[in-house]
Amino acid sequence: MIIVYTTFPDWESAEKVVKTLLKERLIACANLREHRAFYWWEGKIEEDKEVGAILKTREDLWEELKERIKELHPYDVPAIIRIDVDDVNEDYLKWLIEETKK
């Protein structure tokens, strides 16, 4: 299992991408949360509202998921960050495997 973290400029784009990834069975679930982001862009520090997405999936779907997020994402340079999960309860992992691409 892996967790993929990415951010979106608003709820609408986050929900659209997440629902597409769910329908395509590239992820088993997602958690969305609004937050403030501070970052460098074109030589200056910017501040914006963003929606962070925690996506849960299988390790073998990483490359396909990463490419699909790039295709769907509204940002020019989206953060698509993989976090390897070393341990997870067996029932959750079984559910995740059953709910993602066969």
UniProtKB/Swiss-Prot annotation:
UniProt entry keywords in alphabetical sequence: Copper, Cytoplasm, Metal-binding
GO biological process, any: response to metal ion
SUPFAM superfamilies assigned: GlnB-like
InterPro entries linked: CutA_tolerance, Ion_tolerance_CutA, N-reg_PII-like_a/b, N-reg_PII/ATP_PRibTrfase_C
TM region positions: none
Taxonomic superkingdom: Archaea
Binding site for Cu cation: D48
Similarity comment: family membership: Belongs to the CutA family.
NCBIfam families linked: dival_cat_tol_CutA
Quaternary structure and partners: Homotrimer. The binding of the copper ion probably leads to oligomerization.
Protein role: Involved in resistance toward heavy metals.
The protein, known as: Divalent-cation tolerance protein CutA
Originating species: Pyrococcus horikoshii (strain ATCC 700860 / DSM 12428 / JCM 9974 / NBRC 100139 / OT-3)
Taxonomic lineage: Archaea, Methanobacteriati, Methanobacteriota, Thermococci, Thermococcales
